[in-house]
């Protein structure tokens, strides 16, 4: 009887550890995605983006479209900022910001690869002019 209880207890402990690990990973991924959206949201608000544009982005039913729309809005802002002030480092910072977040959250990699290429292409075009 003691062996059966010990075996069952070990299985329960193992199951609980796996459940805790799974929950922690899920929370980390969600927190990273939420942090990315919130940091971009406050950045956009602080740079003068219109509230109705933000509502249109975040009220979208597709979260992947919302993330992409937010980043495209940032890209448009950086393009305007670059042409107005000639600050190339802002565009480079945006590229590094997107690369850092795509390496953390796996499902964002496929979403941001075309966007990253667009940013790099746009940056190269602006540098040449």
Curated annotation (Swiss-Prot):
Lineage of origin: Eukaryota, Fungi, Dikarya, Ascomycota, Saccharomycotina
Additional facts recorded: Partially overlaps HRT1.
Membrane topology: Multi-pass membrane protein
Intracellular or extracellular location(s): Membrane
Annotated Gene Ontology cellular component terms: membrane
Listed name of the protein: Putative uncharacterized protein YOL134C
Residues passing through the membrane, by range: 38-58, 95-115
Signal peptide feature range: 1-24
Keywords (A to Z) from UniProt: Membrane, Signal, Transmembrane, Transmembrane helix
Organism of derivation: Saccharomyces cerevisiae (strain ATCC 204508 / S288c)
């Amino acid at each position: 009887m003691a062996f059966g209880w010990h075996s069952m207890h070990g299985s329960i402990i193992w199951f609980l550890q796996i459940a805790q690990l799974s929950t922690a990973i899920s929370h980390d991924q969600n927190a990273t995605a939420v942090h990315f959206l919130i940091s971009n949201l406050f950045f956009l608000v602080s740079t003068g983006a219109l509230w109705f544009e933000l509502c249109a982005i975040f009220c979208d039913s597709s979260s992947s479209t919302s993330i992409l729309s937010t980043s495209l809005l940032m890209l448009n802002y950086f393009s305007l900022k670059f042409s107005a002030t000639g600050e190339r480092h802002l565009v480079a910072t945006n590229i590094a910001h997107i690369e850092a977040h795509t390496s953390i959250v796996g499902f964002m990699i496929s979403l941001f690869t075309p966007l990253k290429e667009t940013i790099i292409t746009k940056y190269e075009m602006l540098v040449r002019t």
